[in-house]
Amino acid sequence: MKGHWAEKTLNQAYSDGILKGSGSKTMSPNSSVTTAQAVTMLCRVLHVTGQGDTSSLQIPQGAWYTQDAAKAVYAGLLDNRDAGQLDQSISRKDAFILFDKAFQIAEAQPDLTVLDQFPDATSLTGQSQRAAAALVEAGIVSGSDGKLQIDRPLTRAEFATILYRLADQYISAAAFTGHTGAGSVLSGDADLSGVQMGTIWFDQSASNIRLTDVTAKQVTVRSDQLTSLAISGTGEISRLVLAAR
């Protein structure tokens, strides 16, 4: 992998425990990501512990991802429409949807005109269209050769790159000090005061969140254990999203 264009990002994802080797201690950065691998990594990001019903997913007996798929169902990343697809390479457009489900980036009525520059985006509809527009508008996805390449399989390197463009640090809320270049995914209870942030996500481990004089573009709460959320002071949060599951 040395010298690969995404080497730094892949190493960081490995260090953060999000990306594992693909066998024989190799990262296989140019290999495609399967749906099972994608949701497994996103569940690691969100610290999902709950498990949903996977009976409709047609998971092969003994599949390595059985428990991870159950977590993904619980977190709202998978449903019966994904039946029989978990071992298949995930397309870029379907990956866009997963990133949106995990990070809640698309607004109800996003600016779809940002997709006009990509001729292959005309076939996008519904959630894939909204997710793609949100990722493009935020500068997370830019496409290649003038296209979004929506039907091409997403590689491991591309997955990690999108992930770290969305959020460049995955740390405990207690260790968070303020603004970073991208967003931040925080775990555990939080008591933040007087900090400026771009976008922040509280993962599923947060129970109590207190934000005092906090300024942020977006705050998203993904916790299913939340008992209290207090926002006060003179800060400004442009968008607050409560998405427990």
Predicted features, each with a name:
Residues M1-E7, S15, K20-K93, F99-Q129, ...:
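Feature responds to low-complexity, polar/acidic, surface-exposed segments characteristic
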Residues A132:
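Flexible glycan-contacting loops in extracellular carbohydrate-active proteins
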Residues A138:
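Short His/Asp/Glu-rich catalytic/ion-coordination signatures at enzyme active sites or charged loops
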Residues F159-T161:
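Short, structured beta-strand segments at or near domain termini in extracellular proteins/domains
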Residues A173-G178, G183-R245:
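Short, T/G/N/S-enriched strand-turn elements that build extracellular solenoid repeat scaffolds
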